[in-house]
Amino acid sequence: MRPFLLAGLAALALAGCQKSTETAITRTTANGVDTLYSKRTVVDGVARFECMASRSGQCHYLLLDPACRPDAACARAPIRSFALAVGTTQEFRDLPKGFAQCVSEDRKEQCHRE
């Protein structure tokens, strides 16, 4: 009986140790070639951005307040704007939970298209 109890407690302990993870991939292609390829992961509040391909040589990011949506105008200014060269990554630990993003091969002031 005791081994079953210990095994059950170990399983519960491991279940409590799982990290909160979110992944988003943005990828566009033209004629079978990546024009933009970006990956964002958020693990336990640490957001990691990775620029894997961009026709311009850089991935340009806008990070938005959780109340904003990338497909609509928002009165609030972006939380952060930055660019990454292809093959590089950037981490942030201070972003609000639920932030939105848009990424493009060229610098933009807003995410939505007019």
Tell where the protein language model's regions lie, with residue ranges.
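Sec-dependent N-terminal signal peptides
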Residues: 5-12
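Post-signal peptide N-terminal segment of mature Sec-exported envelope proteins
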Residues: 25-43
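Intrinsically disordered, low-complexity Pro/Gly/Ser/Thr-rich segments with frequent PxxP/GP/PP motifs
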Residues: 70-100
